[in-house]
Amino acid sequence: MTSDDIARSVPSRSVETCSALTPEQTEAVLELLAEAARIDGQQAVSEQGRIQLRHSGGGGREGVSHLLLTVGGELVGYAQLEDTDPVEAPAAELVVHPSHRGHGHGRALGTALLAASGKRLRVWAHGGHSAARHLAQVLGLTLFRELRQMRMPLTGLDLPDPVFPAGVTVRTFVPGQDDAAWLAVNAAAFAHHPEQGSLTQRDLDDRMAEPWFDPAGFFLAEREGELVGFHWTKVHAEERLGEVYVLGVRPGVQGGGLGKALTTVGLRYLAAQGLPTAMLYVDADNKAAVSVYERLGFTTYETDLMYRTET
């Protein structure tokens, strides 16, 4: 959710809701997102949202809607609404072209999202900008989640050798061979986190098709041939950032130091790629995880905020 909170009448403005987009519409939205990211210094739509956007042709994705705001036929705003969680309200992200902010387009998109979601809505504000906070207030949304992006320097990194629990060995992910086992452990490790824990084979395939995917940075921990944990890293080549993309430990194996050991393996790998900085995302209310990362040397870089309608 970005700035743009002034409600003014724009006669030529319209909002179209689509379950699937044409290649031309997809390209126009991607260009809008790129320009917004260039001006704002960050993405307005998450990686998951951008993947769903790029795969929005054909019949689209079940539970995913795309809202296109045009003025005089020109695309000036975009929102994505995902209604796939059986419990939580539909989740949305939105953006207005930097050259068209200040004309009520953000509020128009927000109002359309409320209508499309049956007034049960969660909205991300990446970076937590003040204009986004104000728009959330105007729409009657309240803050309920804070997601921290934390970073640490990798230059000169001197981490102790990882110490794994007895019987645990580490190897890298083999696409096509380890898919089912990884999906099962990921679902178990993130049962409390529907966004991550609900990943499907299609979601995994989409990520493996991304240019950044490299199984050499996807580490699996096994005991007696069974997967018990993993650390999937990601390299942001353009920004020269290494990410602790997903780190998970199977329930029942937690508490033995496996998570810390896997973190060390991944950070060492990222440092060996010559990347100067590592990053990760963690919920602010996960005090234990935040404390672990702070002890490793991570500090908060920025915070994404999620707002929702009152339940």
Model-derived segments and spans:
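Short amphipathic alpha-helix that is part of the acyltransferase structural core
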Residues: 2-54, 162-197
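Conserved donor-binding loop and adjoining core beta-sheet/short helix segment
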Residues: 21, 26, 31-117, 122, ...
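Hydrophobic beta-strand residues of extracellular immunoglobulin-like
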Residues: 65-68, 217-220, 264
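Glycine-rich acetyl-CoA-binding "A-motif" of GNAT/NAT acetyltransferases
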Residues: 73-77, 144, 215, 226-229, ...
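Phosphate-binding active sites in nucleotide-utilizing proteins
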Residues: 190-236, 251
